[in-house]
């Protein structure tokens, strides 16, 4: 029987849902994106796909040749695959959303508060863990990871080098004034310690300070070593940016594009950029996750599919699983297949939202009035009705339906947040208050054409540059609903359609042209470090963290007020969270469009499939699943 739609969600607000708890932010192109090159017709199975113990996952998010971490790319599908390839983090989040030391990895740990207000985390690694090539994993690999990813050498090849940002001695090490990282110590072959700055404490997610993901020093810097001294740990031997350009950045053999030695549940086998297909193979050396669970599916293939044809691909057997499916028409097509017994499905609420993301460093979207005016030009209720088909709700701030904070705040949200109901007159009032009162000739605005404003003695037009995802139903719907009202308010919307890789380079300010707005989706991580996502500190101004490039005193203060709240103080956290989303709702670095119900549709041969959004994504669910 077809699942009943969440029609009550469309009444402008919300209904309570089962609680789910909720790092850098995941970035996806509003859930649906460009079609693949379609190497296999939907009516024909792809070659070699008669193999039984493999899982083909269809994704609508374009993949990049990036398999290192979110600091190089926070693209949605790559973001999830990192956890399949890499592993043995000392601190993990459980299936219940709690943080703990991973007993598969950690033999013992100790936290000591120092007299100067700093805190030292000492962690001993279990014997017997090995890299996929059989090389033993030791504390050196963990210390190397911190030194590598905090180093000026890594920064020179395009990595932000922020891993050790919160640790004592980071500034001196990153600036190159010392080769020793004072807050990082190699205690013995299996033990390391890190000391957190007093200024970073207390922290809501303080256990995470003890967490490190190892990196294979023998691959990335084979002629280097990690040594310890009273001044802190350091890297000796050959370790230069020129070396890292080869071992990390080489597009064919570097660790970013081709990580051949890993310690996660799966090995990186291949990635075909043109076919948009990644192949992962089971890692026989993997010791298991925090529960000791190891995968049984031999091969995982991740393949780009089109939102228009992906249900046909699933029905034909060209893919086995479609994860995080959204959009009313697509969901209905999947539920029809379920009614026919062709597929099984599960659903869960989203820990994130679809959005228009603003770049707040660019004129004229550096003005909150302009951002709010654009919001007033869009009928978001109608947008949600058309796009989600009853499986979603309008969001009004930085939250998703799955968050417990949202579920405990439904009435409060409806009473306290601006819903930005479509009102072109309100948009005009905001623009006039912001100084957009002139025409092209410098005379008072006549009510026709584009508004102008005098800035530093020059007339500037009210032109918004939109980087839109290609072949994207969200972008298509926005293109039918937004331009006319913006024009009526005196704004000009210029649309440039592009693939996700090009779009992402603009978001990260690594391309020649930076746009004012993008249609995207965001996943809110379990470790929801809002104080970094909206920090004024330039170190966090980057894709994956403060991707809005917003430097606002009130928003920064509201986010940082949450940092020191103890992890178990839910009442104080909730009150501060409400204050934060209220300030966010006023500053509006994004226009939240919708948060919705995600569906996973899969072939009945896929057994024990149990995923949720941020807490237990498909990269975790794969470990429990089997092919039967």
Predicted features and spans:
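Short, low-complexity disordered leader/linker segments with a strong preference
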Residues: 1-52, 115, 438-456, 626-628
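N-terminal lobe/hinge region of extracytoplasmic solute-binding protein
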Residues: 55-116
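Gly/Pro-rich hinge or "lid" segments in bacterial periplasmic/extracellular proteins
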Residues: 95-96, 210-292, 299, 429
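Aromatic- and charge-enriched surface segment that lines or borders ligand/interaction sites
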Residues: 107-163, 187, 193, 313, ...
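Surface-exposed binding/hinge segments that line
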Residues: 159-243
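Ligand-site clamp/hinge motif
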Residues: 252-257, 285-333, 483, 492
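Append "and occasionally in soluble cytosolic enzymes with long acidic Gly/Pro-rich linkers
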Residues: 281, 366-483, 579
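Detector for C-terminal structural segments
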Residues: 377-412, 474-483, 508-628
């Amino acid at each position: 029987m077809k699942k009943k739609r969440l029609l009550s969600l469309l009444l402008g607000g919300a209904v309570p849902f089962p609680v789910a708890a909720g790092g850098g932010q995941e970035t996806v192109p509003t859930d649906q994106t460009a079609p693949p090159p379609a190497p296999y017709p939907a009516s024909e199975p792809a070659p070699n796909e008669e193999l039984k113990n493999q899982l083909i996952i269809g994704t609508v998010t374009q993949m990049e040749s990036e398999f290192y971490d979110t600091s190089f790319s926070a693209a949605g599908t790559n973001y999830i695959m990192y956890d399949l390839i890499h592993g043995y983090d000392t601190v993990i989040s459980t299936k219940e959303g709690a943080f703990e030391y991973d007993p598969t990895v950690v033999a013992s740990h100790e936290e000591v508060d120092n007299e100067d207000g700093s805190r030292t985390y000492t962690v001993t690694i279990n014997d017997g863990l090995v890299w996929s090539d059989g090389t033993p994993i030791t504390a050196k690999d963990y210390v190397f990871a911190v030194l590598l990813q905090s180093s000026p050498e890594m920064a020179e090849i395009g990595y932000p080098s922020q891993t050790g940002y919160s640790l004592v001695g980071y500034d001196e090490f990153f600036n190159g004034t010392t080769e020793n990282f004072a807050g990082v110590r190699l205690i013995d072959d299996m033990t390391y310690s890190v000391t957190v700055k007093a200024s970073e404490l207390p922290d809501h997610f303080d256990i995470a300070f003890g967490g490190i993901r190892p990196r294979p020093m023998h691959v990335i810097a084979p002629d280097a070593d990690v040594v310890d001294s009273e001044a802190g740990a350091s890297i000796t031997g050959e370790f230069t940016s020129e070396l890292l350009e080869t071992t990390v950045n080489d597009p064919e053999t570097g660790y970013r594009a081709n990580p051949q030695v890993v310690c996660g549940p799966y090995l990186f086998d291949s990635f075909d950029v043109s076919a948009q297909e990644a192949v992962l193979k089971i890692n026989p050396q993997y010791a298991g996750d925090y529960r000791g669970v190891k995968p049984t599916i031999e091969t995982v293939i991740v393949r780009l599919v089109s939102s228009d044809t992906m249900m046909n691909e699933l029905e034909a057997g060209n893919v086995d699983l479609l994860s995080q499916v959204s959009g009313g028409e697509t969901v209905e097509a999947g539920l029809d297949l379920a009614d026919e017994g062709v597929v099984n499905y599960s659903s869960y609420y989203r820990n994130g939202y679809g959005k228009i993301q603003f770049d707040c460093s660019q004129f004229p979207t550096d003005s909150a009035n302009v951002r709010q005016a654009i919001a007033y030009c869009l009928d978001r209720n109608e947008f949600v009705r058309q796009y989600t088909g009853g499986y979603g709700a309008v969001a009004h701030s930085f939250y998703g339906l799955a968050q417990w904070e949202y579920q405990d705040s439904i009435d409060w949200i409806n009473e306290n947040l601006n819903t930005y109901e479509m009102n072109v007159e309100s948009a005009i009032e905001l623009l006039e208050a912001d100084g957009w009162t002139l025409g092209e000739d410098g005379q008072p605005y006549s009510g026709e054409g584009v508004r102008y404003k005098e800035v530093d003695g020059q007339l500037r037009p009210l032109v918004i540059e939109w980087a839109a995802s290609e072949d994207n139903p969200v972008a298509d719907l926005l293109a039918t609903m937004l331009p006319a009202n913006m024009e009526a308010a005196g704004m000009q919307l210029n649309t440039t359609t592009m693939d996700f890789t090009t779009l992402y380079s603009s978001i990260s300010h690594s391309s020649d042209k930076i746009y004012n707005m993008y249609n995207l989706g965001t996943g809110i991580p379990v470790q929801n470090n809002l104080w970094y996502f909206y920090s004024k500190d330039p170190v966090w101004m980057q894709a994956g963290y403060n991707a809005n490039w917003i430097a606002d005193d009130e928003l920064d203060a509201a986010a940082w007020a949450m940092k020191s709240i103890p992890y178990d103080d839910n009442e104080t956290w909730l009150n501060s969270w409400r204050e934060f989303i209220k300030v966010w709702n006023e500053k509006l670095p994004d226009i939240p469009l919708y948060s919705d119900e995600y569906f996973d549709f899969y072939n009945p041969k896929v057994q024990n499939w149990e995923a949720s959004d941020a807490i237990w994504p498909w990269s975790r669910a794969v470990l429990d699943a089997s092919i039967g």
